[in-house]
């Protein structure tokens, strides 16, 4: 049996964090993907964005209670416990700042939006190249069943 891929998640302010965790962690889910599990998360959140501010606490609670995900207080600690990262923050204005902390050579999936400005998108790609960090960004609907 291949070793499990331990995934960390940054940004627990979107329903996507629960959807991805369910298909990776819940073996009973009809779309379960074996071989990987979300094991660690950093809540993040954006006080200036109501879609984030109003949801981060509840989603963080669910991640820990329903899926046993270890919640960390900072990104650096999270990265030491995982093999790959899902950057899920709903407020795309935070993606560049968060990615700067995540760019340590481990693969990072950046949920939509990749960035909110062209300059930030180019900066993300430059940082990924400089640090040897593989990145991917897309809408999850592209892969929906």
Language model features with spans:
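Conserved short-loop catalytic and cofactor-binding motifs
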Residues: 8, 112, 138
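A contiguous active-site-proximal alpha/beta segment in oxidoreductase catalytic domains
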Residues: 115-145
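Hydrophobic residues in well-ordered beta-strands that form the structural core
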Residues: 73, 110, 135-137
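Short helix/strand-capping hinge loops at secondary-structure junctions
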Residues: 107, 112-113
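Proline- and acidic/polar-enriched loop/turn elements at helix boundaries
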Residues: 76, 91, 113-114, 140
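N-terminal glycine-/serine-/threonine-rich beta1-alpha1-beta2 phosphate-ribose binding loop
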Residues: 1-104, 121-122, 130-131
């Amino acid at each position: 049996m291949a070793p499990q891929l331990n995934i960390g998640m940054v940004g627990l302010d979107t329903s996507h964090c629960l959807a991805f965790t369910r298909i990776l962690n819940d073996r009973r889910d009809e779309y379960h993907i074996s071989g990987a599990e979300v094991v660690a998360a950093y809540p993040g959140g954006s006080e200036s964005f109501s879609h984030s501010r109003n949801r981060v606490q509840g989603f963080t609670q669910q991640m820990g209670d329903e899926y046993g995900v270890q919640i960390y207080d900072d990104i650096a600690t999270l990265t030491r416990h995982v093999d790959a990262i899902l950057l899920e923050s709903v407020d795309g204005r935070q993606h560049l700042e968060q990615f700067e902390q995540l760019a340590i050579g481990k693969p990072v999936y950046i949920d939509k939006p990749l960035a909110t400005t062209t300059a930030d998108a180019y900066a993300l790609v430059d940082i990924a190249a400089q640090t040897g960090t593989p990145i991917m960004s897309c809408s999850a609907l592209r892969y929906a069943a």
